[in-house]
Amino acid sequence: MNEKILVVEDEEGLRLFYEEELKSEGYEVITARNGKEAIRQVEEGSPDLIILDIVMPVMDGMEALSRILRKDRKIPIILNSSYTGYREDFMSWAADAYVTKSTDLTGLKNKIQELLKKKKVK
């Protein structure tokens, strides 16, 4: 069975880009436009990994991170933002990784593989 990745991104073009790229790598991909939708997706069926934008309407990524971790600490979460300043925010330390947004998804894909491999070992 393919690992299920939840991509949480408010920018539609970027969300679709991530979805297509990750599907081409063999992952099952579900998406959410904001933190509130992400929490609903987690409640409906735990993804194997979450890629979480930070700056979003309705509920931002930091609030969503906090709420998701209260529900399930086992899901690896990658914070994904254009803003490098959030890397220093102590709340971001609760995530498993922080990857700066880029049109080259090599770093993100490598981090996904690494975290999913770690999850299987546990």
Task: Kindly give the residue locations of the regions a language model identified.
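Conserved acidic carboxylate
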Residues: 9
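Charged docking surfaces used in two-component/phosphorelay signaling
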Residues: 16-24
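Short hydrophobic/Thr-rich beta-strand motif most characteristic of the beta2 strand and flanking loop
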Residues: 26-33, 41
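Alpha4 helix (beta4-alpha4-beta5 surface) of REC/receiver domains from two-component response regulators
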Residues: 63, 83-110
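Acidic catalytic/metal-coordinating carboxylates
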Residues: 34-37, 60-63
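Hydrophobic/aromatic residues positioned on beta-strands within the core alpha/beta folds
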Residues: 78-80
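Active-site residues of response regulator receiver
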Residues: 53
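Receiver (REC) domain active-site loop signature in two-component systems and cognate sites
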Residues: 56
